[in-house]
Structure formats: structure tokens, C-alpha cells
């Protein structure tokens, strides 16, 4: 797998899928574009699905076409309406609307009829072998498969057995329906693939009507054909399935949908295997599927990522035919770009030390106007209370600073953001030598917009101790310590690379206006980073998740 850094991410040109679509439209191969997004409702969508959603819906929109949402609900054991609902919520959150909501189960009757047609054409048969016998009989890439002893049953016998399978006469695994193709075919998928298996389980939509269910390779292409899908876009691992996709369509003589493949998304410091993510949830390594450290769409939404930033990310990553490893910092860059333009600003102090202004009038409160977003100078402002005692960040003061240190120091001056210039006069320490208070004086003539403007090199944020609101801060980092999680040695437990510091819970002291913010997106804690109000918040306890840092060395 090729690692892609910021320079390697493609600039925006026509990708190969756009070239195919434009050629198809120009030649008349199709009159309009119809795509689909076909998730299986057996789990929560992740960032890789988000890319696929953006591609399928985005291509259709660009070329004036439509996109269906089709749930591939062919395995009743693993599927649930809970996942159906979450998938629909995720797609809407990303900003897309589907043309039709469809289910593979809508087509069970038609798929069954086509299966009988294949039997009548001598292209399918009922096999009594066990799963293990079928697997062994397929052979290997170097060794041809072995024909089943049941392969040459008559059409009449196969029809009778298949109908008995449908009627519930047989137990799970007792019989299967297989396509009759070529047991020596170089493509292993052509060695008499399974079409139907017996599963006596309640289906989330069809109930107990069916006890036989179609396999993915059989249901997928035919469902596309029923919906007149012109461009069936899959990830690269399905390229070997395409000849079989075409074989079924050809033999049944139905609308010729076409499958195309693109490289799936691989991110640094991330796993997207459904099995591994489920293990993280079940073993309480994370709080749930929507844990902000998870690569699920509901997880990144809870962390504070915006749909605009995810669409931007999908656009920047682009569409490729080759597997790539994309730097997680690109996704962080995208959300930072979006939030920098739109997010409201507030001051929050995480590691406070008290700063006392000795020449401030006791009990006096002065309210300052501060812009909610400097990018919109004509936009709304907020009121910030200023008093003679404030909190500043402990690391914004140094007794013995290095050269070019522009924050507060003994006898040094800084501006308290939006207010006055102050000068450090005295440092108070406890018995252990820890700084507990910094005493300063302020220059009353240095108020912004009043008198002669005087500049200083340092400006720091602060919060009035009298008005400070305590909030819980959840500081999230990468879930894993290894960048290339897909390249860890075979047999090694991926959980060995879990980052023990992926979540640090602390507290901060916020200006009161923060608690009144109803923008619905992450806000910027000035000079700190972007934070999103967590659903765990209550009127008595406000919780903020760190979305991303304010700055990063990554540039696009």
C-alpha cells in the first residue's frame, strides 16, 4: 500500500469514474445516471462509507442523475432496524437525499423466480454437501475444484428440492442452491458459487415468510438491474466479483447494470474493520459506537466534525484505482478549515492560576464586546465580563523565560485579550514553591478604542474568576499509536497498539457566554482549539469534546 502525504493527494481533475460517466452519456450508452449506496444494515457506518456516500451521491448530482439507498438485507441473523435508522441518519447528516429507499428483501420474490429460471436453463442445482465439503471441493488457485456428486441432478429434481427448501422442509445448512458454471475456472468465484442458503430466522422486514436467503453475489447485480442502476460503484476488493456480476445479468437477459471499482479509504492511526470495531465496543475499550475516538460517522459527528468538512475531505482524497494510506491530519485539516470560517469564539482556561489586578476598583465589573467570529467583523458579538481577579493559563507565565517569549513574565507586559494591558508586579507562591497568584497593575488608558493606542507583543486569554463557569473537557487523541495499522505483523494483536492517552478528562473555566451558545457546531476556545458540546451535557454540567487542535504543521 502506498502512503500518501499532503503533496501526494491529487489536485482536482476529472477522476476515472467521471470520465466513464461522461463517455457513457456522450455515446448514448445511458441517457441518465443512476447510482446507489447499498449498505448492509448490520452495523454503523464509518468514514470509509462516508467517502463512498459522497462519491455515489456526488456523481449522480453532478450529472443530473439520481441515487437510491438500498439496504442489502439478505442475512436476517445480523440485521436490525436499529442499523437501518442510524444509516439513514448518517446519510442525511452528510447532506444527501436519496431518490428511493429500497431493500434487497423487496426483490426476494423476483430473485426466487430468476433462481428457478437458472435451474430450468441447467445453470443451477441443489447441493447436499456440507459447508466444509463445498469449501474443500473448490480446490485452490493452483488446483482445480471437484464437481459435487449432486451437480448433475435433473432440472425436475432440482426444482422440487429448491421449492422444498423454500417451503421449510430442510434444516439450516442441509442444502444450498449453487450456480452451475465451471469447477476448474481460474477465478475461484466461478466455481459453482452459492446462490441460496437456508436460514430459519426472523427477518426484520419480511418476518418469517422466507427461510432461504440469496447470497450477496447473486442478489447484488440483480438488485442493481431491477433498479436500472447505470453505474454500480464498489470498492476495489469487489473487482474479482465483477465477471460473476456480469454472468448473472447475461444469463438472465436483464437490464445490464455495470460495476466499477475504486480504492477504499485507508487512514493512518485507524482501523475500520467491522469485526475489530465491534470488539472495541464489546470489550469497553471505547464507550460505544459513537465514542468520539471511533471512525464511525456517529463518532466523528459527536467529536464535532461537520458534514461540510467530511465532504471536503472526500473531495481532497479523490477517487483512485490504487490502495492509498491517507494521513489522518488531512481530515483534521478539513474540519479546521471549515470551523475557522464558521465557529464562534470563546475564552476557556484549562490550567488556571489566579491573576489579581491591584489597582482595579474593588467590586467593579466592566463588560467588553468581543466578536463571535473575527472572520465576520460585521457579525454578532458577545459580552465578556472583566473584573479585578481573573484566571490565566499557568503556561502563559514564566519567571525565567527564554528569548522571544512574549507572554507574561516578571515586570513584563501583555494585553488581556479584548481588554487592557497589564504589568506583572509580584509573584505569590505556596510553601512548596508553586505559584498561586500573580499580582499585576493595569493601564487604564490602554483600553481598545480609547485614548492613544499602545501595542505590546503578547496577548493572552483569561476568564473572570467571579463569572467563570466550570466545564468538563474531554481531550481526545488518536485511538492507536501505530500509523499503519494495516501493516502490523500477522498474528499480533492490534489492541497492543491502543493509545492509553487517547482520552484525558479534565476541566476548564469558561466565560459565561459559552454556555449560551446554540450554534450547533464546534466552537473555538481561543488560543486552544476547537471543541464540541457533548450530548452528555446537562444544565448542571457542560461537557465539551476536543475536535482538533487550533493549528497543525500539516498544510494542504
Where are the predicted features?
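Basic/polar N-terminal segments that are highly enriched at the extreme N-terminus
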Residues: 1-12
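N-terminal catalytic cores of NTP/NDP-binding nucleotidyl/phosphoryl-transfer enzymes
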Residues: 10-22, 26-88, 204-235
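Residue-level signal for inorganic ion chemistry
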Residues: 28, 56, 87, 118, ...
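Conserved short loop/turn motifs at secondary-structure junctions
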Residues: 38-42, 70-78, 100-109, 132, ...
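Active-site cores that bind ATP or allylic diphosphates and position pyrophosphate for catalysis
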Residues: 73-75, 81, 103, 117-276, ...
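A glycine-rich helix N-cap at a beta->alpha junction
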Residues: 83-109, 114-115, 122-125
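Long, charged, mostly alpha-helical binding arms that flank functional sites
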Residues: 256-334
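Substrate/cofactor-recognition hotspot
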Residues: 314-556
Amino acid at each position: 500500500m502506498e502512503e500518501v502525504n499532503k503533496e501526494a493527494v491529487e489536485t482536482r481533475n476529472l477522476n476515472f469514474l467521471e470520465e466513464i460517466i461522461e463517455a457513457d452519456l456522450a455515446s448514448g450508452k445511458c441517457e441518465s445516471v443512476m447510482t446507489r449506496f447499498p449498505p448492509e444494515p448490520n452495523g454503523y457506518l464509518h468514514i470509509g462509507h462516508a467517502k463512498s456516500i459522497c462519491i455515489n451521491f456526488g456523481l449522480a448530482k453532478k450529472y443530473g442523475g439520481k441515487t437510491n439507498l438500498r439496504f442489502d438485507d439478505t442475512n436476517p441473523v445480523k440485521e436490525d432496524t436499529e442499523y437501518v435508522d442510524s444509516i439513514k441518519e448518517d446519510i442525511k447528516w452528510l447532506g444527501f437525499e436519496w431518490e428511493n429507499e429500497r431493500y434487497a428483501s423487496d426483490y426476494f420474490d423476483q430473485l426466487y423466480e430468476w433462481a428457478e429460471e437458472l435451474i430450468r436453463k441447467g445453470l443451477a442445482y441443489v447441493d447436499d454437501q456440507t459447508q466444509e465439503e463445498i469449501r474443500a471441493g473448490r480446490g485452490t488457485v493452483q488446483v482445480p475444484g471437484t464437481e459435487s456428486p449432486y451437480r448433475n441432478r435433473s432440472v425436475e429434481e432440482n426444482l422440487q428440492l429448491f421449492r422444498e427448501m423454500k417451503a421449510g422442509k430442510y434444516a439450516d445448512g442441509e442444502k444450498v442452491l449453487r450456480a452451475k458454471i465451471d469447477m476448474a475456472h481460474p477465478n475461484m468465484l466461478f466455481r459453482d458459487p452459492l446462490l441460496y442458503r437456508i436460514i430459519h430466522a426472523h427477518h426484520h422486514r419480511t418476518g418469517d415468510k422466507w427461510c432461504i436467503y440469496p447470497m450477496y453475489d447473486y442478489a447484488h447485480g440483480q438488485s442493481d438491474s431491477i433498479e436500472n442502476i447505470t453505474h454500480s460503484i464498489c470498492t476495489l476488493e469487489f473487482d474479482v466479483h465483477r465477471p460473476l456480476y456480469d454472468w448473472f445479468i447475461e444469463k438472465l437477459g436483464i437490464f445490464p447494470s455495470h460495476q466499477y471499482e475504486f480504492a477504499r479509504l485507508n487512514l493512518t492511526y485507524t482501523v475500520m474493520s467491522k469485526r475489530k470495531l465491534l470488539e472495541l465496543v464489546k470489550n469497553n475499550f471505547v464507550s460505544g459506537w459513537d465514542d468520539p475516538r471511533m471512525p464511525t460517522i456517529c463518532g466523528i459527528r459527536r467529536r464535532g466534525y461537520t458534514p461540510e468538512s467530511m465532504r471536503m475531505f472526500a473531495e481532497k482524497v479523490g477517487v483512485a484505482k490504487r490502495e492509498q494510506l491517507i494521513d489522518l491530519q488531512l481530515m483534521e485539516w478539513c474540519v479546521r478549515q471549515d470551523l475557522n470560517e464558521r465557529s464562534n469564539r470563546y475564552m476557556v482556561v484549562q490550567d488556571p492560576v489566579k491573576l489579581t489586578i491591584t489597582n482595579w476598583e474593588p467590586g467593579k465589573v466592566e463588560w467588553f464586546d468581543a466578536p463571535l467570529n473575527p472572520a465576520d467583523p460585521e457579525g454578532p458579538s458577545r459580552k465578556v465580563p472583566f473584573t479585578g481577579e481573573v484566571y490565566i493559563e499557568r503556561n502563559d507565565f514564566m519567571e525565567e523565560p527564554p528569548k522571544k517569549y512574549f507572554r507574561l513574565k516578571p515586570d513584563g507586559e501583555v494585553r488581556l485579550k479584548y481588554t487592557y494591558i497589564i504589568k506583572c508586579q509580584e509573584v505569590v507562591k505556596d510553601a512548596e514553591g508553586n505559584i498561586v497568584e500573580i499580582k499585576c497593575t493595569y493601564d487604564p488608558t490602554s483600553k481598545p478604542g480609547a485614548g492613544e493606542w499602545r501595542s505590546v507583543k503578547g496577548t493572552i486569554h483569561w476568564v473572570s474568576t467571579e463569572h467563570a463557569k466550570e466545564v468538563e473537557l474531554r481531550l481526545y487523541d488518536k485511538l492507536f499509536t501505530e500509523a499503519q495499522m494495516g501493516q502490523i505483523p500477522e498474528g499480533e494483536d492490534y489492541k497492543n497498539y491502543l493509545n492509553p492517552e487517547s482520552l484525558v478528562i479534565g476541566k476548564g473555566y469558561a466565560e459565561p457566554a459559552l454556555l449560551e451558545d446554540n450554534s450547533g457546531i464546534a466552537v473555538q476556545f481561543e488560543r486552544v482549539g476547537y471543541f464540541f458540546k457533548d450530548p452528555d451535557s446537562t444544565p448542571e454540567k457542560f461537557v465539551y469534546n476536543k475536535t482538533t487542535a487550533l493549528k497543525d504543521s500539516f498544510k494542504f
